[in-house]
Regions:
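Short, polar loop motifs at secondary-structure junctions
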Residues: 13-20
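Glycine-rich beta-alpha junction loops
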Residues: 18, 33, 133-136
Length: 202
C-alpha cells in the first residue's frame, strides 16, 4: 500500500532476509539480530512513521522466549527510533485479546499488552495499537507461518461470510489504515478489526 500511495516517498524495510519486491521507494536493510540495532541505527533517522508488524506465534514457546521476541525486541526498536525521531507516529500490530492491564492469565495477552503500554508511554508524537482478529491476505500476501497459510486455503470457501465479522480485516486495510492514521490523527488509539477497516477509508 505504501508503494502505491503518492503520500509516501520512501519505505525503509528492516528484514532478516531479502524480499522479492524491487521498487524505487524501497530501501531494504538486512539485519539478523534484532536484539542489537547499533550497527544499523544510522539508517533509522528522519522518518515520519514506523509500522511495526513483526511478531511470532506463542504456540509452543515458553514465556521467557516469547517475551524476548515480542517485548524486548520492540523495546530496542522503540528506544532507537525515539532517539532519532521523537515526532514520528508509531503503529504496532498487536492482536485481538491483548491485555493492557498486563494481568491476563493468558501469557501472550499479557506480553502484548505490556508491549502496547511501552509504545504508548514512550512519548512519540502519536501511537496506535492494532488488534485485529483474523487477517485476510490480499494481493498475493503470504504468511511466513505455514500453518496460517494452510488455514487460509481451508477457509477460502467461507471468506465471503468472514468479511462480515467485526474482528476480521485484511492486509490491504491494515496498510491503508496505517497510512491514513499517520496523515490524519484520531482519538481512538487501540483499534479492533472493524476500526482498522474504518481507518482504512481515510
Amino acid at each position: 500500500e505504501c508503494l502505491d500511495d503518492d503520500r509516501i516517498i520512501e519505505v525503509l524495510l528492516i528484514n532478516r532476509s531479502p524480499i522479492d519486491i524491487k521498487h524505487p521507494k524501497i530501501n531494504e536493510v538486512i539485519h539478523r539480530d534484532f536484539t542489537d540495532l547499533s550497527s544499523i541505527q544510522h539508517e533509522l533517522k528522519n522518518y515520519n512513521a514506523c509500522f511495526h508488524c513483526m511478531g511470532v506465534s506463542s504456540a509452543g514457546i515458553k514465556e521467557e522466549q516469547y517475551f524476548e521476541l515480542t517485548y524486548t525486541i520492540t523495546e530496542n526498536l522503540v528506544n532507537v527510533l525515539y532517539n532519532f525521531n521523537p515526532n514520528m507516529t508509531f503503529i504496532y500490530v498487536s492482536g485481538d485479546g491483548s491485555d493492557s492491564t498486563e494481568n491476563s492469565k493468558t501469557m501472550w495477552a499479557r506480553v502484548k499488552g505490556k508491549t502496547e503500554n511501552l509504545i504508548f508511554n514512550k512519548g512519540f508524537k502519536d501511537a496506535y495499537a492494532f488488534r485485529p482478529g483474523i487477517i485476510l491476505p490480499k494481493r498475493g500476501v503470504k504468511s511466513k507461518t505455514k500453518l496460517y497459510n494452510s488455514l487460509y486455503v481451508l477457509m477460502r470457501p467461507i471468506i465471503p461470510l468472514m468479511k462480515k465479522m467485526k474482528s476480521v480485516t485484511s492486509t490491504e486495510n491494515i496498510g491503508k489504515a496505517m497510512i491514513g492514521l499517520t496523515v490524519n490523527s484520531q482519538q481512538v488509539k487501540i483499534l479492533s478489526g472493524s476500526e482498522i477497516n474504518q481507518a482504512a477509508l481515510n
